[in-house]
Amino acid sequence: MTTWTAPLAPQPVHATVTVPGSKSQTNRALVLAALAAAQGRGTPTLSGALRSRDTDLMIGALRTLGLRVDGTGPELTVSGHIAPGPHARVDCGLAGTVLRFVPPLAALADAVVEFDGDEQARARPIAPLLDALRGLGVRIEGTALPFRVHGSGALAGGTVAIDASASSQFVSGLLLCAASFTEGLTVQHTGAALPSAPHIAMTVAMLRQAGVDVDDSVPNRWQVRPGPVAARHWEVEPDLTNAVPFLAAAVVSGGTVRITGWPADSVQPADNILSVLGKLNAVVSQTDSSLEVRGSGSYDGFDVDLRAVGELTPSVAALAALATPGSVSRLSGIAHLRGHETDRLAALSAEINRLGGDCTETPDGLVITATPLRPGVWHAYADHRMAMAGAIVGLRVAGVRVDDIGATSKTLPDFPRLWARMLDASLPDGEEHGM
């Protein structure tokens, strides 16, 4: 682990930032490219793909399944067939997309594929997806990592009911492979309110872009017809969730940050992100190719339902902790975060309170009363979003040390350098922040 002193922003931050490609879109595109190649449709390609631990784990998983992925940077080519060798083992690391998108793909192999990952990943929810695959006739050993998928070379498909209240990725994982099932697939969500619905919308949009027929006209029900998956070129958008900490720097410092490449029409939950920023006295300006946020440096507490965009919670909690002293913020709709890379609600409460803050867990979220914070160690829990949240707090509080900034390699390996470059752009000539 690499301890990192979060740099202070003693003056307004004014910078232009370019963030790499979307993790969510990259890993979905890789799965769809693998399916197209396996169907013999051609050679799909990706440009702007994110290269990080999560996406490299997905590339490794596809190679384990017998596919070929060429390219060392953001330009990738996928070819080959689903034909794992003996003793095939997929390393999921801590990547939820690998854990939940690849088992349905492995079910199409005529082989046994073992799945395992980081110790923390063994606590991440997966049983509902495995049960759904069993309901479709797949033989699976285990109910959590490590587990084995006994593929038979084909899958009939049909109809499956699943409780995806713990993770929308259960639904996405099934939908991504459904067109390759003999009968297609109908997925019915049967549980409580579905979290991260925009990520299922992203999956549906990308399936349609690949020529797959998807009917999502009935709430909580998705029907995918069997058929070809196009071997197309995927242009990956910048990761808008990873852009949020940089936009937060404008909010807390009273500066202006512009994100380049912000799409005018996105498959990511852009509208949800803009809605959150609108609660923080921020002025948001958007063009066809960028987004600019001008912060006031001061804002009151706020109420926000983050069910659709739970990934934003650590950054939003950090912003709540830095609001006008005495103001109260309520973050709701995020009970499912207890099953993310770490229990994010417990982790955020512990770290904010460790620095002298006032954060209380509720059944489905957090209540944060802004109080002056003190220097100290901010623990990342091997969680990229937690590490970035510590960086946001450090903009306003001198002496905050993130105990594992390397956790950001999960989705943004260049985070420390990008963060320092953003702050350096606001300093007088000749001065710079350390990385």
Curated annotation (Swiss-Prot):
Q: Does the keyword Kinase apply?
A: no
Q: Which GO terms describe its cellular component?
A: cytoplasm
Q: What is its main location?
A: cytoplasm
Active site residues per record: E311
Please tell me where 3-phosphoshikimate binds in this chain: K23, S24, R28, S167, S168, Q169, S196, E311, H340
Pathway annotation from the record: Metabolic intermediate biosynthesis; chorismate biosynthesis; chorismate from D-erythrose 4-phosphate and phosphoenolpyruvate: step 6/7
Signal peptide span: none
EC number from the UniProt entry: 2.5.1.19
Query: Which GO terms fall under molecular function for this chain's record?
Result: 3-phosphoshikimate 1-carboxyvinyltransferase activity
Q: What Pfam families would the database entry show?
A: EPSP_synthase (PF00275)
Q: Which GO terms describe its biological process?
A: amino acid biosynthetic process; aromatic amino acid family biosynthetic process; chorismate biosynthetic process
What general EC class does the enzyme of this chain belong to? transferase
Report the family membership.
Answer: Belongs to the EPSP synthase family.
What is the name of the protein in this document? 3-phosphoshikimate 1-carboxyvinyltransferase
Q: What is the lineage of its organism?
A: Bacteria, Bacillati, Actinomycetota, Actinomycetes, Mycobacteriales
